[in-house]
Amino acid sequence: MNRGRGVRKRNAPEKASILETCDEEIRAEVAQLFNKVRSYVPPAGEKWTLPDPNVVLCDPHVSHPRLQALKHSLNEVKNQLSDKDLSVWHQHTCFTNRAGTVTSHLRSTTNAELCTQAWAKFYEILGTFQLLPDSALKTGELNSIHLCEAPGAFISALNHFLKTSSLHCDWNWIANTLNPYYEANGRGCTITDDRLIVHTLPWWFFGSDNTGDIMLQKHLLELPRFVSNMRSVDLVTADGSFDCQGDPGEQERLVAPLQHCEAICALLLLGTGGSFVLKMFTLFEHSSVCLLYLLACCFRSVNIFKPGTSKSGNSELYIVCLDYQAKEQIRPLLSKLIRNYGPDLASTASLFPRRCIPDSFLSQHEEICTFFQALQVNTIQENLRLFVCMSTEQRRRLEQLREYAAEFYTKRFSVQYLPRKSWVCRGGVVRWVKVCERKQMGSLNQRKEMELQGWKQRLAQGNYGPFIEKHLVAAEGCEVVLNGPLDECDLGAWFALEGAALPKVCSSIFCDQEMLDFLNEALEGNLRVKTVNWSLKALPTCSSCSSDSPVSILSEICSHPDVTSCLVLGSQSWCDDKLTGVRIQPEFLQGPSYCGVQNVTMHDGQPDYQLELLNAVLFALQKQDQGSTLVIPLSSALTRFTSGLVFTLHLCFRYITFRCLSGWPPAALVCMGFSPPSALPSLLDFLQNVMEKMKKVELGRQVLQFVPLEELLRGELPHFLSSFNTAVIRQQLHMLIQLDQST
C-alpha cells in the first residue's frame, strides 16, 4: 500500500459566506427588513404636554376616520385568510418569513439560552436602540423589570447581551407573568412554559393572591415594595398579550386594557432616564392614540419598531421609549390613573379627550400607521399569491433571503457565543417537561363552526377521541409506580403559601390541559350534573370496561404476604362488602367527604375537602407501623396542595401506585411499605401548623401550596401525578360519554 508517499491531501476550499456572494437586491431587501422604525418628533417650536388630570377618563371614545379606514382596509385583506387551515397557513408563512431561520441559526452558533422568536426580537431591540441608560452603566448597576414575561426570553436575551458585550455591571431583575402554577388561571391568557421560571422562582412577582395578574390594583401597589431593594429602575419591558384568534380583527381593542396597565406600571416604577419597551399591535383606535401621546409626553424619544424577526404579516409592533423625563410632572395624572387602575381602565372612557391630542401628533401618528399597515398588507398579499403558486425560482430566492437574513442578523447585532455557565439557569433544562400547549387547528371559519358544537363532537373530531372512547381491557394504575422513600428533603424550605381562593380548577401542571378543558366543559354542560340532587357518585359504570372495585383492590392488598396492616382513609361504606379469604382485615379511618354538585369543576381544589384530607393523612401517618399499607381514595391530584400531600407520602413509603375504580372517588392511591423518615416528627409538626393556618385563613383566600415547587417538580413525582390525573380524567370523560348516550 502506498500511504501518502509524501503527497499532502488538499483541503477543500472554504465555502464563501452568503454575506459576500449574494446579489445587491437581496442585500437591500434584508437591510430594509431590519430597518422598520418610525419616531414621534414634536415640530420645531412646539412642545407636547401632558393634559390636565381633571380631563382624564372623562370623555367617551371617539374614532379617527383616517385610522378607521386603514383598519377596515387591513381587515378586508385579513378576511381572505378566514378559510385557510391555520396549521397549513402557519407552515407556509414560516417558509416565506425572511427571518424564519434566525433562531435556529442562533441556537447552533451562539448557544443562546431559551432562544425563541421573542429572544431574537428583544436582542434586535437591544442592538438597534440605546436601551440601557448610560447612567446605569456608569454606576455599574442595572435594574430591570419584565412584565408579562413568560417564558422568560427577554431576560435570557438581556443576559446574553450583557455577558457578551463587555458591559460590566451588577444586573438585578424582577419578572412578572400570569402564574402558570395557579390552578384558576386559564390557558387563553396564561403561558404555561416554565422552563426559566422554575429555576428562578424567587425573582418572579405573582402578587399577594398568587395569580400574577398585573391588572389588579393591589398588585400594582405591591410591586414597588417587591423591587424596593433596587436603587432605581432603569428598564421596564412589557410583552403582554393573549389569544385573540377567535376575533383577530379586534385584537387591538381586546388587548388595550392590558397595555394601559403595563404602561401605568412602567411610569410608576421607572426612574428618571429609564427606558420602556411595550408590545402593541395595530394603532388605529383612540385608546392607542391616547396611550402613545402619554408616552410621547413622558419620554425624550418614542419609537415604533417592527423587528425583522417579528413575522411581517402580523400586527405586532414594539414601542421603544427612551429617557424617561416626566417622573415628577406626571405624578398628579398618574395618581388618578392608579385610582382607576384595573381591567376596565379606558374601556368606557377615553384616557384623554380628542381636543387634548395636538394635530401635529395625530398627523405623525396617521403617517406611522399608514407605513406599518402597508407593510403588513403587502406581506399578506404576497403570502396569498405564493400560497396559490410558488415557482422554483421564487422558492430558491426565498431560501437565499432566509440564509442571508440569519447571517446578517448575527453580524449586524454582534451576537457572540455564550457558554452555558453564563446562562441565567446554569443548571440547564428542567427535568420535568409538561405536555405542550394546544395549537389552534383548522381555519377561522372552521374554528367558529366548532365553537357551536358540543364537547362530545369536538372531542370525537380531535386527537383525543379514540383515547377517551376506547374501552379498557385492564384496570389502570398498577403499572405506574413511584418508588421511594424519597431522600431526605429540606423541611426548613417548606412554607404554607396563601393566595386567592380557587373559584375553579382550570389548569394544572400535572395533567394534560386540553383533557381537563374537555372534562370541565362536560361537567358544566351536562344536564344531570346540573341537577340539584345529582352527585358524582351517579356516574354510570361502563359494562364494556375492565375496572377494579374497592373490594377487589383491598382483597388483593390484604392477601399480600408482605402486608402486615392496611389502613383505609374512608368509611366502611366505601367498601360495600366484608372481605373474605384474606390474611388481614383493613382498618377504616374517617376520610374526607367528597364535594357535591356545586363544586364539580373544583376537583381537589375545594378548601374544606383539602383540610379534611390533610387531617386524615396527618392522623394516618401517626397510626402507621413499619411496613404497613395506606389506601387513600382520591378524586384527583390536580392542585399543588394535593400534590404536596402525595409528595409527603412519597417521603414515607417504599412505593406508591394507584388504581382506577368503578365508582366514586374514581381512584385510590396505594402506599406500600411505611418507612418513616428521621424527620417524621418535624414533618408532622409542620403539617399540623399548616392545618391550623388553613382553619384561620380569611374569607376569599386559601392555602394553595406547602411543598416548594422545586420539590414537586423534581424526580419521578410529576410523571406519576400526570399519569394519575390523565387516567382519572380519561375515565370520567369516558363515563360522561356513556351518561350522554343513556339519556
Curated annotation (Swiss-Prot):
<feature type="binding site">
    <location>
        <position position="239"/>
    </location>
    <ligand>
        <name>S-adenosyl-L-methionine</name>
    </ligand>
</feature>
<dbReference type="InterPro" id="IPR050851">
    <property type="entry name" value="mRNA_Cap_2O-Ribose_MeTrfase"/>
</dbReference>
<keyword id="KW-0808">Transferase</keyword>
<dbReference type="GO" id="GO:0032259">
    <property type="term" value="P:methylation"/>
</dbReference>
<dbReference type="GO" id="GO:0006370">
    <property type="term" value="P:7-methylguanosine mRNA capping"/>
</dbReference>
<keyword id="KW-0489">Methyltransferase</keyword>
<keyword id="KW-0506">mRNA capping</keyword>
<feature type="active site">
    <location>
        <position position="239"/>
    </location>
</feature>
<feature type="active site">
    <location>
        <position position="121"/>
    </location>
</feature>
<dbReference type="InterPro" id="IPR029063">
    <property type="entry name" value="SAM-dependent_MTases_sf"/>
</dbReference>
<keyword id="KW-0963">Cytoplasm</keyword>
<keyword id="KW-0507">mRNA processing</keyword>
<dbReference type="GO" id="GO:0005634">
    <property type="term" value="C:nucleus"/>
</dbReference>
<dbReference type="InterPro" id="IPR002877">
    <property type="entry name" value="RNA_MeTrfase_FtsJ_dom"/>
</dbReference>
<keyword id="KW-0949">S-adenosyl-L-methionine</keyword>
<feature type="binding site">
    <location>
        <position position="152"/>
    </location>
    <ligand>
        <name>S-adenosyl-L-methionine</name>
    </ligand>
</feature>
<dbReference type="Pfam" id="PF01728">
    <property type="entry name" value="FtsJ"/>
</dbReference>
<dbReference type="GO" id="GO:0004483">
    <property type="term" value="F:mRNA (nucleoside-2'-O-)-methyltransferase activity"/>
</dbReference>
<feature type="domain" description="Adrift-type SAM-dependent 2'-O-MTase">
    <location>
        <begin position="113"/>
        <end position="326"/>
    </location>
</feature>
<protein>
    <recommendedName>
        <fullName>Cap-specific mRNA (nucleoside-2'-O-)-methyltransferase 2</fullName>
        <ecNumber>2.1.1.296</ecNumber>
    </recommendedName>
</protein>
<comment type="function">
    <text>S-adenosyl-L-methionine-dependent methyltransferase that mediates mRNA cap2 2'-O-ribose methylation to the 5'-cap structure of mRNAs. Methylates the ribose of the second nucleotide of a m(7)GpppG-capped mRNA and small nuclear RNA (snRNA) (cap0) to produce m(7)GpppRmpNm (cap2).</text>
</comment>
<feature type="active site" description="Proton acceptor">
    <location>
        <position position="279"/>
    </location>
</feature>
<dbReference type="InterPro" id="IPR025807">
    <property type="entry name" value="Adrift-typ_MeTrfase"/>
</dbReference>
<dbReference type="GO" id="GO:0005737">
    <property type="term" value="C:cytoplasm"/>
</dbReference>
<keyword id="KW-0539">Nucleus</keyword>
<feature type="binding site">
    <location>
        <position position="171"/>
    </location>
    <ligand>
        <name>S-adenosyl-L-methionine</name>
    </ligand>
</feature>
